[in-house]
From Swiss-Prot:
GO cellular component: cytoplasm; nucleus; plasma membrane
Name assigned to this protein: Acireductone dioxygenase
Pathway(s) it belongs to: Amino-acid biosynthesis; L-methionine biosynthesis via salvage pathway; L-methionine from S-methyl-5-thio-alpha-D-ribose 1-phosphate: step 5/6
Segments crossing the lipid bilayer: none
Entry-linked CDD domains: cupin_ARD
Organism (species): Danio rerio
Functional description taken from the UniProt entry: Catalyzes 2 different reactions between oxygen and the acireductone 1,2-dihydroxy-3-keto-5-methylthiopentene (DHK-MTPene) depending upon the metal bound in the active site. Fe-containing acireductone dioxygenase (Fe-ARD) produces formate and 2-keto-4-methylthiobutyrate (KMTB), the alpha-ketoacid precursor of methionine in the methionine recycle pathway. Ni-containing acireductone dioxygenase (Ni-ARD) produces methylthiopropionate, carbon monoxide and formate, and does not lie on the methionine recycle pathway.
This protein's encoding gene: adi1
Cofactor note: Binds either 1 Fe or Ni cation per monomer. Iron-binding promotes an acireductone dioxygenase reaction producing 2-keto-4-methylthiobutyrate, while nickel-binding promotes an acireductone dioxygenase reaction producing 3-(methylsulfanyl)propanoate.
Binding positions (Ni(2+)): 91, 93, 97, 136
Predominant location: cytoplasm
Length: 181
């Protein structure tokens, strides 16, 4: 998974969440379609993340003032199985979710404006932002390994609100933004 790729998911498959779940035939989703729903992506050099001027520029432009690093692997993340279940529960946040993949690979699933799942494959060097108010979930792929930088504007907030959360103002603002783009 070296190329940023997204596709509509086979939602009927009850298979392992870590599998690609592509439809047959595959239905790719373009970068423009992702941007329409507020999902943005950059490809950076993860080998120099500690001193990367491009990352620093993005952080300054977007106001990403706080960061930490999480390693998602059975040997590195306490309570791994329960954390994976929690990450894969459909939810939204009151703030943007910003993740920079430093090692490994994984999937972010997001809902489009028609409520269909789009699976986004991310791997080393991918920086992705999901807008506040979008329903989404996360899972590792079959590698069972991702090391990611989590970026935040101001103090970090890790509160997830599981679906249904349609009454939240941030959800209403997000849905309204889709009609105006």
């Amino acid at each position: 998974m070296s190329v940023f790729e997204a596709w509509y998911m086979d939602e009927e498959s009850g298979e392992d969440q870590r599998l690609p779940h592509k439809l047959s035939p595959n239905q790719p989703v373009s970068v423009q379609q992702l941007e329409h729903i507020g999902v943005f992506h950059w490809k950076l050099n993860a080998d120099i993340y500690e001193n990367d001027p491009e990352l620093q520029k993005i952080r300054e432009e977007k106001g990403y003032s706080f960061m930490d690093i999480i390693t998602i692997h059975p040997d590195k993340l306490p309570d791994y199985q329960n954390k994976l279940k929690m990450f894969y529960e459909e939810h939204l946040h009151l703030d943007d979710e910003i993740r920079y993949i430093l090692e490994g690979s994984s999937y972010f699933d997001v809902r489009d404006e028609g409520d269909r799942w789009i699976r986004i494959a991310v791997s080393k060097g991918d920086l992705i932002t999901l807008p506040a108010g979008i329903y989404h979930r996360f899972t590792v792929d079959e590698s069972n390994y991702t090391k990611a930088m989590r970026l935040f504007v101001g103090e970090p907030v890790w509160k997830a609100y599981n679906r249904p959360a349609d009454d939240f103002d941030i959800r209403k603002e997000y849905v309204n933004s889709l009609g105006s783009s």
